[in-house]
Structure formats: C-alpha cells, structure tokens
Amino acid sequence: MRSGRRWCGRWLAVLIRDVEVERHGRVDVRVVAGRVAEVGARLGGSGGIDGRGGALLPGLHDHHVHLAALAAEAASVRVGPADVAGPEGLTQALRGGAPGEWVRAVGYHESVAGDLDRAILDRFVADRPVRVQHRSGELWLWNGAALRAAGLDDAGDGRFWRADERLRARTPPTPLDLAGVGRRAAARGITGFTNADPHPAPELRTLLRPLPQRLTILGLDRTAPVKIRLDDLTLPTATDLAARITRARPRPVAVHCVTRVQLFVTLLALDEAGSVSGDRVEHGAVIPTEAVDRLRMLGVTVVTQPHFLVERAAAYEKDVAADDRPHLYRCGTLRAAGVPVAAGTDAPYGTSDPWAVMRAAAGRVGPEGLTPRAALGLFLGAPLAPGGASRTVEPGARADLCLLHVPLREALDDLSANCVRAAFVNGRGISA
C-alpha cells in the first residue's frame, strides 16, 4: 500500500480516499499534523491512499494488557491446557531447551498436571533452572535448580505468590519481543494500549518505547488511574480500602476484582471515599445482580474479559461456584443498566486478539450477549474514558485510525482481524 503522505508546510499530511466513515458514508479523509483535518467527498489533492470502499474506524484500544509479560512470551514455553497434556507433556515441554539454561514457562493451570511445587518440578526436570507461571499471572513455581541459581535455596516449596518484584532481580533478563508485539497489534488494528501492571517499574515507559502504539500506563501516568490489586486472603476492610482510595485522589482508581467479596468491598469503599470520573473495576469477573445498580450509581466503569468464558470454560465449570457462574464477566446486562463497559484482552493471560474478544462478547446467548457493533465498541472508548462514547473519525480527532479491507457491515459479520488492512498512529502507518 502506498503511504499517501506529503508535507503541508511543516506538517505531515495524509489523504485517504474513498473510505466508509460512520455518519458520513463514502468519503475522503485528510490528516494533517496528526489529526483529522477534513472529512468529505472528493477532497482536493494529489496522490493519497486508495481505501477502495473499506471502513475507516478509530484505532482499537486494548484497555487492559500486560505489555512486558506479553513481549516475554516469545522467549517462553507455553504449558497451558491447550498446549500440553498431563505430566508427560509438561515434562517434554520443559525439557525442550539446552541443559543448564533457564526455562521460562507460562500459562500453566492445574488441569494440566495438578498443583506444582519444587519437589514435583524436580521430578519432571532437575538438570536446568525452571520457573513456571500460573495463567493467572500471580503465582510462580520454581524447581530446585532455579532456586539454587537465584540464591533462594531456602525458599521452601518454590511457590511464589505475587512476588514478581522480588524475583525479577534474581533471574536472567528475559528478551522482550516488543517489535513483534507492536507489529501483531497493528495488524489487528490496535493503535493504543493501557498497561495494567499493579506495580509498574519507573522505567517501564522507557522499556516500552519501541512500541509504535499510543501508551497509557496505570499508576505511572499522572492522569491515569492508580491500580489497586485485591486478594481474598489479604482483603482489606472497606474502610481501609477507602483510605487507600482517598490517598490516590484526585486520580481515579482501577481496582482488580475477580471475586464477589472483592467487588462488594470495593463498592463499599468507593461509597465511603466517594467515586470520581474514571474509577474502574478491572475484570469484574463476578458481578451479582444486586451489585449492578450500585455500579451505575457510583459511575464506575467495568473493564472486562468476556473471552475468558471461552478460553477457560472447562476450568470455570469445575472451579467456579455454581451460584457465581450466572454472574461471570457480565456485558449486556451492565450496558442495559447504564454501567459503562469496556474490554481488555488481559494478554498474555488471555488472547491478544481483540477481535476474538469481540466474537466472544457477540456470541453469548441471552441478555449478556452484545450486538457485533456494541462488541466493537468495547475497544473504541478513549484511553481515559473506557466504556464512554466511542471515538469518531471527525475533524479535530486524533488520527489514530484503523483501515479495513471491507465496509463495516461485512466486518461486523466476521469480527475478524483478517478485515484489517492498516493502522495509523498520528496519521503515520504502523502496519503494511
């Protein structure tokens, strides 16, 4: 595809011809200085990109992702239920590298080979350091060779819960394929990410600089929400959580809620501290019916992962309490009640393909299902206003754009990344 770029005075100008833009029909779009300058029929100017009638959308924004972990996947062994079967398959996967070299395995779930600890991993692999990450992202499992190599031989059973910061300095650096992450995201029409690590290192923004997408980093960016991660075993009282929320003000908060009790404590705390625009519940894995109106009254956005119901169906059937299953990863009923809803892939702990998330949301049966257009809208909110009004291709708008091969109606029939032709950030193409 020709770039269609030229210089207009000091500013880069891009003309995209014959594209379908919502509320405008088939038009031309001119971009100047990183923003949409004109939308109209047969705009003047030479050259340009021929859109061939494909839809031109605002670029997709993944509202919840863990970018460093996603970039580390290329140097990792996948050992989830879809990748290996049983202790034999796990052992074979872990033995794939050279003896003595560190093995970083990701995506593990107990359905593969049961609960793991140091002794069990040593029976599988003893001649090289092995660390296995649970698919929740919150638990690392190390064998004896890894513990000895890291100077942690006295670390008991080798199970480390939420200890990434402690462990990071004791392991060899993991190569990060940020170029690959950015390239694959661009091919799916993603022009922005919200990184949702609970404790981002101060140097994270510098680390992620190779990505061509626009970045929002929870906790680091002064205008972004502060991430608060809850755990049932160490759950604060509502009053203690309210005090923590108050300390974060005037910034909004993004509270990790994956259980019923975490959600109720969060709602009580927000009621006590007072909610502000931009407050978010991350995941909203279990939202009982009685909590929906409270979310609406507090004005809290839910950033959810409907694809987990597809990816983790067997585990949820086995592990989730029967009275919680009807309330998993709500979408449609939240929207119907006036609760803002957005989606994030939660990659690498879920698929990194937002179109797969859309298909999961649109494919649900009953009141939680969304129309394909509403499913697309899960990724069209502004970075700091997920679940709010969808961004639009209008004069003055930032030129973060997604060009499709086909009109929008056809794209909504498929909800597939195959429909994506190109992505632009500030009017500059970031994919071929």
Identify the residue ranges that each predicted region occupies.
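Short, well-ordered coil/turn segments that N-cap beta-strands
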Residues: 101, 128, 190-191, 211-216, ...
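Divalent metal-binding segments
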Residues: 9-209, 222-246, 252-258, 262, ...
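His/Asp/Glu-enriched, well-ordered alpha-helical/loop segment
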Residues: 249-254, 263-279, 283-284, 289, ...
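Short beta-strand segments
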Residues: 104-107, 217, 343-344, 403
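Extended hydrophobic/aromatic segments used for targeting, binding, or gating
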Residues: 207-226, 287, 293, 417
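Glycine-centered helix-coil hinge/cap
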Residues: 40, 126, 219-221, 318-325
